[in-house]
Amino acid sequence: MIKISYSPYTLKPVQSLNAATAATAREGVLLKVEWNDGLYGFADLHPWPELGDLSLEEQLSDLRMGRMTTQIEQSIWLARRDALLRKEKKHVFDGGEKIKNNYLLSHFQDLKPGFLDGLKNEGYNTVKVKMGRDLQKEADMLTHIAASGMRMRLDFNALGSWQTFEKFMVNLPLTVRPLIEYVEDPFPFDFHAWGEARKLAKIALDNQYDKVPWGKIASAPFDVIVIKPAKTDVDKAVAQCQKWNLKLAVTSYMDHPVGVVHAVGVAMELKDKYGDMILESGCLTHRLYQMDSFAAELSTQGPYLLKNKGTGVGFDKLLEALTWYQLKVR
């Protein structure tokens, strides 16, 4: 038996986070999970209903009824990792290999003169661009990024169509396409259409992961799996990468700083274990929100997230000071 408590929080975006969402406050809960062996650990639960998740209240309601969503299963798995590290008085960053992160550009208006040179000077190699608001302006932005020599990751969040994607890619300047590392979820998963899309760019699978009939495919019509430990079974995703000779990138779920540190910890562990199979991560998403007491404890050095104070995922004093509500299972 485990005992689960939760503490609600609100994150306030600095601006709209992607083409699927408005810049409205986002609700989530931190979870405190306690086991019979006396260990306890912390994790985040931050659903994105806009991208197909059950709502926060639906997931908590399921949990009260004794049912666990995939997200809650992952939260408990992460909390157990945290608990074991707290027992050993170790930090989640202590055992892995340092890993770079891409810079997330959520809006083309962020691209000010000198901005890209500043990123390069800080040590960034790669910019991830949220696509789909205004493809013409975004194409112009990609041209500017390509001129800087930085690699690009394009994320369409499966909101487009094959026809729109093909037209967009074919019309890009010749200087741009060679610097596109991959395109994430170009449109809703379709085995044959994604296979055609691969002729235009390397394709990464992210929020369409559950749409793939893994037991039925004879080949993988994509090159990279992007996993979010907050909602993806990490071991299963790694096994698929090994089976189909794919690369893997770890990203946070644009969630609470607790979730950010968990994601980086997983990325560092995988990089240490699997080497070149693991690409740069995309976990520096805490800066998309207004500063709070948790985000204030996070520091970066260019594309690296630095170790914060505490054991496990850290934040010891802040977590201790929160009000926790026990979740009663019916």
UniProtKB/Swiss-Prot annotation:
Binding residue positions for Mg(2+): 155, 184, 206
Listed InterPro entries:
Enolase-like_C_sf (IPR036849), Enolase-like_N (IPR029017), OSBS_N (IPR041338)
Reactions this protein catalyses: (1R,6R)-6-hydroxy-2-succinyl-cyclohexa-2,4-diene-1-carboxylate = 2-succinylbenzoate + H2O
Q: What is its EC number?
A: 4.2.1.113
Give this protein's Gene Ontology molecular function annotations: lyase activity; metal ion binding
What keyword terms does UniProt attach to this protein? Lyase, Magnesium, Menaquinone biosynthesis, Metal-binding
Family annotation (Gene3D superfamilies):
Enolase-like C-terminal domain, Enolase-like, N-terminal domain
Q: Name one GO biological process term.
A: phylloquinone biosynthetic process
Please give the pathway this protein is involved in. Answer: Quinol/quinone metabolism; 1,4-dihydroxy-2-naphthoate biosynthesis; 1,4-dihydroxy-2-naphthoate from chorismate: step 4/7; Cofactor biosynthesis; phylloquinone biosynthesis
Superkingdom: Bacteria
Q: Where is the active site?
A: 130, 228
Report the cofactors. Answer: a divalent metal cation
What is its quaternary makeup? Monomer.
Main function: Converts 2-succinyl-6-hydroxy-2,4-cyclohexadiene-1-carboxylate (SHCHC) to 2-succinylbenzoate (OSB). Does not show N-succinylamino acid racemase (NSAR) activity with N-succinyl-L-phenylglycine as substrate.
Q: Which family does it belong to?
A: Belongs to the mandelate racemase/muconate lactonizing enzyme family. MenC type 1 subfamily.
Q: What is this protein called?
A: o-succinylbenzoate synthase
Q: Which organism is it from?
A: Bdellovibrio bacteriovorus (strain ATCC 15356 / DSM 50701 / NCIMB 9529 / HD100)
Lineage of the native species?
Answer: Bacteria, Pseudomonadati, Bdellovibrionota, Bdellovibrionia, Bdellovibrionales
Q: Which gene encodes it?
A: menC
